[in-house]
A protein has these predicted regions:
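Carbohydrate-recognition loop of C-type lectin domains
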Residues: 1-49, 97-214, 220-223, 266-532, ...
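Hydrophobic/aromatic interaction determinants used to assemble and anchor large protein complexes
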Residues: 1, 691-698, 705-732
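Short aromatic-glycine-(Arg/Gly/Cys) micro-motifs in beta-strand/loop hairpins
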Residues: 569-589
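A short, exposed loop/beta-hairpin motif centered on an aromatic-Gly-Thr core
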Residues: 537-548, 585-604
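Membrane-proximal bilayer-interacting regions
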Residues: 205-252, 257
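Negatively charged, low-complexity tracts enriched in Asp/Glu with abundant Ser/Thr
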Residues: 528, 533-559
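Single conserved position on a long alpha-helix in the C-terminal lobe of the eukaryotic protein kinase
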Residues: 35, 41, 49-81, 88
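A short, surface-exposed helix-loop junction/capping segment
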Residues: 70-92, 200-210, 638-644
Length: 732
């Protein structure tokens, strides 16, 4: 028994060690379990044969699971893309948005190739910017430069920042005068074009590498000496360009230091080249003026267009698709004498073999589904169909949360799942949030693009973050005050002056015997339609059967707390068989919603109403953020945040406090402001003025009234109850 027997099938060296280890362990276990019963090792024993076949299958499985992880995330004909799994590139994750004046300057120089230089002045008292620019030589659309600068600025504008003016700079025009020698075989016209481009580039260089004081004649000369084709300079000057006829008293003098708005006079006629002498040896060479200008124009545009920006190369992680997910049954490796063929596979031994196959197949199927399991893309949202899959995917999303330092499902969102969000719905909401997390973190301080009135995809990043987190629509074009009117409903709050309507809505004539325990039926959960057409038919049925909706009025209490099925009861009445009633949670009183002879019918209607109110609550949730400084420069570092107060979640003190903490963390620290939780009546007026406020930036006819519209919005907010106002100032 101590004799070591070699396997009778020779394996490759890479796998044989693992196979031998499996075989050794198998024999030790069998020997230990059998004791003195099994005294001889025979390769043809059924147990040995089965063990060896299983060991071969495990050895093959080890090979299949030995590839890099990226290969298992690569599907056939679908290349590996890290963003699919929430693994954003380093350039997206660690990139910083526009913050400083230098950031804006570099951005505009990259995005607007028609300018060679610009000066940005920042007014700290108003948080506004003024831009003066220097045109690029040979610019053809000079009149469009201010429009392009304004457009680029507004695409990257931060909260509470605004653009005061854009104007052409008063440039200091310099004339190049020089005698220099070129190398043998060089074209003088081309070399002169290179010299002019070197000077232009130096005068408009990046501010992070050169300050105004360092733009000196000496530094420029060092750059010119490196120009291709230059042998040496005999003289080299940059003089202020003076028109002797208009300014006879001013003398042209060489400049040793250059201003930030300095630029170079480009020769347009031969007389402009009179003070430039180029030699090849001792021979003076001539310049072709037209070809010189063409060459210089080519150099200018070649080096100023966006396509020639220097980018840091990114290492692309690549995966290889592996066709390893098919399993060759262990039964196929067993001799025919065991009767394991497909025609005779119903015996217990075959079922025992099938258990091995099932375990291996199950593992391979899970490995094959790994791309869908870890994907956060919209097309893979339907993959999570079992509770186990949902738990596994939730853990992966938790990992992404920790990696990016965010919470896509904070505890205060989990506490009250009053809108019946399913586990799959929670996953989809978290996936949508994490798909955008790199952009949200990078552009956290970014404001709305004021030049785009169309609100789709155009909102402050703070609003996008908040709305994506709670599952609301992040566009400013979604007007929540239109939600209830679309369904022909009017919200009636208890604090409304028209309290007589409550007397009509409350069923005060309910017989007290109806409230006896034997006459009260709890409302249970009923499965409803999930498709759009099915929902529409159910809502039409609800509106037609429940007479409550004949009033077109709905109390705020019912609107909010009707999202909970426990607040509905079915009562046995005298005149009618059964009544569906709702008990107010915020004040005393009952509402008779309707009656029917069937408990099942009323129970189903209660479930339909509950789902209907959940959808309305969710649709009524949004956030508005506007910057008063855009109309009133005396309020430079202030934002006003407006939210509806009439939904279930938005009426809860805990939810409001946590929302304030989140928004405070998102709004830049130097910006203060207030949060207003306003009623539906206030929101209707506010949204009207807010849309007009946005229109003032694209409609010149109403732009003079911007400040008046701001005052109208602030007046609407002034009627907010003090308990519904929160400060973003943590010191308060």
């Amino acid at each position: 028994m101590n004799e070591i027997k070699e396997p009778y099938i020779v394996q490759n060296d890479g796998q044989s060690v693992f196979y031998e280890e499996l075989l050794k362990n198998m024999l030790e276990v069998v020997q230990r379990l059998s004791g003195n019963v099994w005294t001889d090792y025979n390769p043809h024993d059924p147990g040995v044969t089965l063990g060896e076949a299983a060991n071969y299958a495990l050895t093959e499985l080890r090979y299949k699971f030995g590839f890099p992880l990226v290969d298992y995330l690569t599907e056939e004909n679908i290349p590996f893309t890290p963003e699919r799994f929430g693994l954003h590139s380093a350039s997206d994750v660690f990139a910083t948005s526009i913050v400083t004046v230098d950031d804006y300057r570099k951005l505009l120089l990259e995005e607007v190739p028609e300018i060679s230089n610009l000066q940005i002045d920042y007014n700290v008292s108003t948080n506004g910017y003024s831009i003066s620019y220097v045109e690029m030589p040979f610019c053809r659309d000079c009149e469009k430069i201010p429009e392009k600068i304004i457009s680029v600025y507004n695409e990257h504008r931060n909260l509470c920042e605004w653009l005061d003016k854009v104007e052409k700079a008063n440039t200091e025009l310099l004339r190049f005068e020089s005698e220099f020698e070129i190398q043998q075989g060089e074209d003088a016209t081309t070399v002169l074009a290179r010299v002019y481009w070197c000077i232009l580039h130096y005068l408009a260089d990046d501010p992070t590498s050169l300050s105004v004081r360092e733009r000196t004649e000496y530094e420029l000369y060092k750059q010119l000496y490196k120009v291709e084709g230059i042998k040496c300079f005999r003289t080299c000057y940059l003089k202020n360009n003076v028109d002797s006829k208009l300014q006879p008293d001013i003398i042209e003098e060489p400049q040793s230091r250059f201003k930030n708005n300095s630029t170079l006079l480009i020769p347009s006629k031969l007389e402009d080249l009179a003070r430039i002498c180029i030699y090849c040896g001792n021979i003076k060479v001539n310049i072709d003026l037209d070809r010189f200008r063409d060459k210089l124009e080519g150099f200018c545009w070649e080096n100023r267009t966006k396509k020639n920006r220097d980018h840091v190369p990114q290492k692309a992680l690549k995966g290889t698709w592996r066709p390893i997910f098919e399993h060759y049954s262990i039964a196929n490796d067993m001799p025919n004498c065991y009767g394991l063929s497909s025609h005779n596979a119903n015996n217990s031994f075959s079922a025992y073999i099938g258990l091995f196959d099932w375990i291996i197949k199950n593992g391979l199927e899970k490995a094959k589904s790994l791309p869908q399991m870890l994907s956060i893309l919209k097309q893979d949202e339907g993959f999570a169909h079992s509770l186990r899959t949902i738990r596994q995917k939730s853990k992966y999303l938790d990992f992404l949360d920790e990696m990016y330092g965010v919470e896509s499902q904070p505890s205060w969102l989990k506490e009250e799942n009053c809108y019946g969000e399913s586990p799959v719905g929670i996953l989809n909401r978290r996936m949508k949030f994490l798909r955008n997390i790199a952009r949200l973190q990078k552009d956290r301080a970014q404001g709305r693009n004021l030049l785009k009135y169309d609100s789709e995809g155009n909102a402050p990043t703070v609003k996008e973050w908040f709305c994506l987190l709670i599952g609301a629509t992040p566009d400013d074009g979604h007007l929540v005050s239109n939600v209830l009117p679309k369904h022909n409903l009017y919200l009636l709050e208890k604090k409304d002056k028209r309290n007589d309507n409550f007397q009509r809505l409350d069923s005060l004539l309910i017989n007290e015997k109806m409230m006896d325990p034997e006459n009260v039926h709890e409302v249970g959960y009923v499965e409803l339609a999930k498709d759009t057409d099915g929902k529409r038919k159910e809502y039409e049925e609800m509106r037609s059967v429940l007479p409550f909706f004949n009033e077109n009025l709905i109390t705020g209490d019912l609107f909010r707390n009707g999202t909970n099925l426990k607040n509905y009861k079915i009562l046995k009445s005298i005149d009618y068989d059964y009544m569906l009633v709702y008990h107010h949670m915020e004040y005393d009183g009952w509402i008779n919603l309707g009656h029917n002879t069937s408990i099942d019918c009323l129970e189903r209607l209660a479930n339909i109403l509950r789902r209907f109110l959940r959808e309305l609550n969710r649709e009524c949730e949004t956030i508005y953020l506007f910057e008063p400084v855009l109309a009133d420069i005396s309020r430079p570092y202030e934002v006003v945040i407006v939210l509806p107060s009439w939904t279930y979640r938005f009426s809860m003190a805990r939810f409001r406090d946590e929302s304030r903490k989140l928004l405070r963390s998102l709004v830049p620290a130097h910006i203060d402001g207030k949060m207003y939780w306003i009623s539906e009546d206030q929101m209707r007026k506010f949204e009207f003025y807010y849309q007009q406020f946005l229109a003032t930036f694209t409609n010149n006819k109403i732009s003079p009234f911007r400040n008046e519209i701001l005052k109208a919005m602030c007046k609407v907010l002034s009627y907010t109850d003090p308990k519904d106002i929160q400060s973003l100032n943590d010191s308060h």
